[in-house]
Every structure is written in C-alpha cells, then in structure tokens.
C-alpha cells in the first residue's frame, strides 16, 4: 500500500478538522500518478476531487485497500502496516495545524527515492517527495 499526504513546512495537515489548503493541479497530479492502481480516500477528501474520476471514496479505505493501492490521507488516522511507499506533497508554506504528519520516516525504514517540484494553481511551488521502505 502507498500513502499520500499533503503537509506544510512544519508537517501540519489539518486545523480544527479542516484541510490546510488544496490545489487543482496537485489533484490532477495525484490522479495521473495513480493511474492503473486504485486510489482510495475518505468521503471528506473526495469532496475536493468531485470534478475528477479515478478514485474510490470510502471511509474504511485503509482497511479495504490492497498491496499496490494508493490511499490519500487527510482526515483519518493511518497505520504503517503493509505500507511500502509514502508520498509527501509539501505546500512550502506554513499554516496553522493541530493534526500533523508524525511518522519518523528514517526510523521506520523509509528512504527518499524521488523529489520533484510542480507549479500549482494556488501555490507557486509544491514539492512532492517519494519515500520507499527498504
């Protein structure tokens, strides 16, 4: 399983139950990147993808996802069991946050294998880093 998170410069994800930001170009990147695999997300996350296709909205997505599937995580908890890859999409901005990405990637055996910057619709630069276990 592969997990996708959006984070700010301090690894923040949400504030008072709401996403920090969103970007239409990043949504399209996620859909294109996961083509050929299942992309799972919560019903909350699916609201921002409503104009796109190629995802499965189900609040039990991490239980239902299979080995090669992707899970886009915003509002739900997550576990590392069975996770082979983590993609961090960094807004390159600081936002207020009370929910943060708290996985110590190195301590859990993940190594950075790729990094790219994209120009978003509402962000000049979004840095996308891919980490793989092993």
Language model: regions and residue ranges:
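Enzymes that bind and transform nitrogen-containing heteroaromatic metabolites
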Residues: 1-134
